């Protein structure tokens, strides 16, 4: 194989994430987290203000299924629940729903309900759902980013496979298979039957980054598929 002195895309992204301080200061020190086992630590970054069940968040706060997570204006919270890592931006309201088959105290997530705000989420859970005021999204082990408002949801399948359906129109549904931010969508709360979901081009100013996805996956001992060499 011919040698190339220019770093390939995966290596370049990793270097950018490290230089930006997104990785090493956040990755759990315990070997169990790096080996992909669940860690008991929840909060890895807190910028500004956040609350869990109405209580202020600090670096020792534990977040688990059944919790209600909110963030203040201009804030950002990076946290892990089991094998699921999330980045929640400011002015967000998120409910973490437990898995139906799990016992009390389990960290396995059954679903996420984003009432408002902006969420980046990485998970290998299959059969999980994310709900917003206008969309129901079936997750099959993916990285996703979404912004939930009262009238529409912005949704990007960063990688993986999802089933998307409009809450107010069962005929508006779509399966998206994405390798790398291939098909962002708007899902509306109102519209013509069968036309509540609209593909959109990539935004001129990205609202989430590969470095953030790399960071989130690293927190649970994984790497995104787009960083893996073919």
List where the protein language model places each region.
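Secretory targeting signals
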Residues: 1-9, 20
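Flexible, surface-exposed loop/linker segments and immediately adjacent secondary-structure boundaries
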Residues: 14-25, 29-65, 72, 80-230
